[in-house]
Amino acid sequence: MKRMICLILALAMIVTLAACGGKEEETIVTTATEVSVETDAVVAPETTEAPTEEVTETTEAPNTVMPVEIVLLDNESCTFSVGPISVSEIAGMQVNVTCVNKTQESLDFSWNNVSVCGMMYDPNWAVTVPAGETLESKVEIDTYALETMGIYAVEEITFQLCVTSNENWMDAPYVKEYFTVYPTGRSADTVVYPVREAVASEVVLVDNENLTFIAEYAEQQDLYYVVRCYITNKTQGTLMTSWENVTVNGLDVDPFWTALVAPGKSAYAEVKFADSDLKAQGIEIVDNISFDLTAYDDADWTELVRVPVSYVPVDEAAVG
């Protein structure tokens, strides 16, 4: 009997030990799995690269010179307003404009015959506004380009606002009218126009009651022989100036040049002769340029100026 009891006790101990051994092995596996997961999530791969720093671009805050919006035109077909106007060293001057189309067709709004402080300057601005809609835009003025003309403060902007049908180009314009804006608060009596400094090599080609035309100098540039000119329109209308019947050293070479100058304004212009055209005529040095200097009223094409000119460049420059 005692032997039976001993056998039973021995079997019970073996079963207990086997059960304990199974639990320990399962715990180890579970623990190893947990350690593996935690290691993958926390430990980052080693790297020798330095941490990157965010590079932020510094932008200059524009200086608002005219903070208000001014309605220049408001009729049954459209409304046009300017402002605010801001200027910065990087972006130049930006004139905010608002165009309202009140018609049943698309309209083209544009600035033509633009001048800044009395000097012609073309910002190449035009927009199309769908029927019944309003469009906001910006007219950008390159202040660096103005500085080459002696303008260091934009005190006056004059432009002809043209509003025309985008669908029927032959129709009469809705608007074709001049406006003047004074961004810095000056007036027509107080605005300061730049004074042109005379150039030693300049030649006055025409100076009468309608027009002053000066050839400042001639020089060789990339691919072109260039005559830089200064023009003043003394009339009350827009002038279309041009060179006609042009010869260089007695040979036909046409630069196909024209320039529009608004009433009472001045302009710098470059008359360009292509090197290829000059070389085709065997011209290596420009000794003389002859032409008819003409000026027409842009409204009705009345000829106001026609003067035969023979221009001899002061500084010789080899073509090309």
Language-model-derived ranges and their functions:
Residues 99-104, 230-236:
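Asparagine-centered strand-capping/turn motif at beta-strand->loop junctions
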Residues 105-112, 237-245, 284:
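Short, hydrophobic/aromatic beta-strand segments
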Residues 2-10, 14:
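Sec-dependent signal peptide recognition
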Residues 89-96, 221-228:
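Short, solvent-exposed loop/turn segments enriched in Ser/Thr/Gly
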Residues 92, 119-179, 184-186, 224, ...:
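Short, solvent-exposed, Trp/other aromatic-anchored flexible loops in extracytoplasmic proteins
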